[in-house]
Amino acid sequence: MAEITASLVKELRERTGAGMMDCKKALTEANGDIELAIENMRKSGAIKAAKKAGNVAADGVIKTKIDGNYGIILEVNCQTDFVAKDAGFQAFADKVLDAAVAGKITDVDVLKAQFEEERVALVAKIGENINIRRVASLEGDVLGSYQHGARIGVLVAAKGADEELVKQLAMHVAASKPEFVKPEDVSAEVVEKEYQVQLDIAMQSGKPKEIAEKMVEGRMKKFTGEVSLTGQPFVMEPSKSVGQLLKEHNADVTGFIRFEVGEGIEKVETDFAAEVAAMSKQS
């Protein structure tokens, strides 16, 4: 077995753009023959995947699955809406979802490692960067899910509710985007930040500090209601709050998770005309 030196790994990285561990693995399998390692990496799609790795993957799908009292929600990203609808991409996302449910896997790095070879092969086939971005689980007495297309997914856990009510609550979460279950769940940090914002606004209106503080107290009660599930008007019957709806059914929500494709990812806007002009200058 030939010695796999650091300089050899470095050279392969520079020539292929692949990661250090992938380069070391390829060189080991090729017994130190760098040309053979490159050839094998080309065949496996590893080089193409490495070149696509820097591309921003902000599109994709949200998948949900419930197995009894256990549910998983998953986001898998690609670069375009076109690929998000591709049968091969959808099948890959479904396979990752099934594995997460079966193994109760909530560590995204574990999923990434488990499906890396399949991901690389799919990148080579499709021609876009693909990323298993995040996964989360929810447990409860009664679970419900809702998906708005493939772009928004919600899991809701409740006690004392039937499946229809939980489904309606999941639809509400998808539409209204609450951040907490109840007003009292809003963290002190979030409350303090909003309090300072509202106090600054009130003070800028020229009100004395004592009056401004009383005004803000009223606004803060409204704020904690707006960002919490039970404090929001129920989307299907806005005359009552979700909290009132739950009270009528003698039910309680114990948790929810809402994923939306690409949230928090900065998507690069491409100027097609400028891109074509740049390419023509290079040719």
Swiss-Prot record:
Positions of region (Involved in Mg(2+) ion dislocation from EF-Tu): 80-83
One GO term describing the cellular component: cytoplasm
Kinase in keyword set: no
Localization of this protein: Cytoplasm
Matches recorded under CDD domains: UBA_EF-Ts (cd14275)
Keywords tagged on the record: Cytoplasm, Elongation factor, Protein biosynthesis
InterPro entries the UniProt entry points to: EF-Ts_dimer_sf (IPR036402), Transl_elong_EFTs/EF1B (IPR001816), Transl_elong_EFTs/EF1B_dimer (IPR014039), Transl_elong_Ts_CS (IPR018101), UBA-like_sf (IPR009060)
NCBIfam families from the UniProt entry: tsf
Protein family membership: Belongs to the EF-Ts family.
Main function: Associates with the EF-Tu.GDP complex and induces the exchange of GDP to GTP. It remains bound to the aminoacyl-tRNA.EF-Tu.GTP complex up to the GTP hydrolysis stage on the ribosome.
Protein's UniProt name: Elongation factor Ts
Species name: Citrobacter koseri (strain ATCC BAA-895 / CDC 4225-83 / SGSC4696)
